[in-house]
A protein has these predicted regions:
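Contiguous segments within soluble domain cores/interaction surfaces
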Residues: 1-117
Length: 117
């Protein structure tokens, strides 16, 4: 399968857009959430490369079905992209009720960090 997002080793741009979408095509309402984290893990490794809310920005808390706008973005920093490889990535949302939900909730997004050509 091809990656959902490709970035070159050491690059911190472009920022990573994300949507929190349910399997049925509807979007989560992120109004009033208490935390949104970006998590990224190298395939085959149990340790997480990234697990942070720092750098996560909510731009559009409410999206309509069919929207191509992102709910938000993750801004890469530091050593986020220093190790080439195929990664799994997901968003962890904590709602005001304290309940937690992972997106995508039907698999993981694929991020590839490549070597510069």
């Amino acid at each position: 399968m091809s990656p959902d997002f490709v970035i070159t080793k050491g690059d911190l741009l472009p920022i990573l857009p994300f949507q929190c979408q349910y399997r049925d095509g509807t979007f989560a309402d992120l109004t009033g959430v208490t935390s949104v984290k970006f998590v990224m893990q190298l395939k085959g490794v149990t340790a997480e490369k990234i697990n942070t809310s720092v750098g996560v920005t909510i731009l559009n808390p409410v999206l309509q079905v069919g929207s191509i706008l992102p709910h938000g973005t993750y801004s890469w920093s530091g050593t986020d992209t220093d190790t080439p490889g195929d990664y799994q990535a997901w968003i962890v949302v904590t709602f005001a009720s304290g309940k937690i939900l992972h997106f995508p909730n039907y698999g993981r997004s694929r991020v590839q960090v490549t070597l510069a050509e």
